[in-house]
């Protein structure tokens, strides 16, 4: 928790404080579920059972099957796994289409793929951060192997219509992989997975600890998907390495907790957002950068006299 009760933390889009009940779940798991989930003896079997329960709980919040949910170390790893895996999986072309305001964990892998000869088309958003979906679709053709777009922008809170984007991409080329970075969207807006092949989420944005995330990988892509990692058979042979069971249980606890209150929280945060917007109008030197239709959890504004890090 905040050591100075007089401070108000305003940077939850960067990271959140771990919820006390989530920390309790992790602490208990570290003491009770110490065995490797892959071990064949009784303590290992109990760990595997707990891991499966955590996977099912997180999957329920996304509306996917348990087997379509893969634990990772963070949202950045989930993005890397999906993007580099897409390039390994689809060999029929070199075309990639991506929005121009993605997280570095999307930008950097695609820069590497561009250096390897892939044709990466970047579609920039408008001045208010709104992305023109039709402009992205204009670049999708028979050679497009991947389209990537974040659901909610982490800087200004713009929400992109990834559901429509995914449906239209599949209509143009059913073999094109559609990846969505939903790190800022999870537990803030409803997520519909129709026509989406891979989707990344992160724990430390929803009051779980840093060091745990997840990747949705659709059943329809599972068999063909070539993961960029090699190693053991964990996570259905797509993400090798002994699973971080305590943090997976923490992620499940955090997701379950927030999933129950998403509608009521949305109403409360919208009221706070509106109150802050109205209050900022009293200061002519303040410029609000987030559009009116941004998610209420993110409000970006500029003020020339105060450094952003001081305000946050």
Where do the model's predicted regions map?
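Pyridoxal 5′-phosphate
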Residues: 1-312
């Amino acid at each position: 928790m905040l050591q100075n009760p007089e401070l108000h933390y305003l940077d939850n889009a960067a990271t959140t404080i771990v919820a006390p009940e989530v920390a309790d779940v992790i602490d208990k798991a570290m003491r009770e579920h110490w065995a490797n989930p892959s071990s064949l003896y009784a303590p290992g079997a109990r760990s595997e059972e707990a891991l499966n329960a955590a996977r099912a709980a997180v999957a329920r919040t996304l509306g996917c099957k348990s087997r379509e949910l893969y634990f990772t170390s963070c949202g950045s790893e989930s993005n890397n796994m999906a993007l580099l895996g897409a390039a390994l999986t689809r060999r029929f072309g070199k075309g990639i289409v991506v929005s121009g305001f993605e997280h570095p964990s999307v930008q950097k892998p695609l820069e590497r793929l561009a250096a390897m000869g892939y044709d990466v088309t970047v579609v920039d958003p408008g001045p208010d951060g709104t992305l023109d979906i039709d402009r992205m679709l204009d670049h999708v053709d028979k050679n497009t192997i991947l389209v990537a777009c974040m659901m909610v922008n982490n800087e200004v809170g713009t929400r992109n219509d990834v559901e429509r984007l995914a449906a239209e991409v599949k209509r143009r080329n059913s073999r094109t992989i559609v990846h969505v970075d939903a790190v800022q969207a999870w537990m803030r807006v409803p997520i519909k997975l129709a026509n989406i092949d891979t989707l990344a989420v992160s724990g430390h944005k929803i009051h779980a600890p840093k060091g745990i995330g997840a990747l949705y990988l659709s059943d329809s892509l599972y068999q063909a998907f070539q993961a960029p990692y090699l190693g053991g058979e964990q996570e259905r042979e797509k993400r090798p390495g002994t699973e971080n069971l305590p943090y997976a249980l923490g992620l499940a606890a955090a997701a379950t907790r927030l999933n129950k209150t998403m509608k009521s929280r949305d109403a409360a945060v919208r009221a706070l957002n509106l109150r802050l917007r109205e209050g900022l109008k009293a200061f002519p030197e303040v410029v609000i950068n987030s559009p009116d239709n941004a998610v209420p959890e993110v409000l970006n504004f500029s003020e020339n006299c105060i450094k952003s890090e001081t305000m946050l």
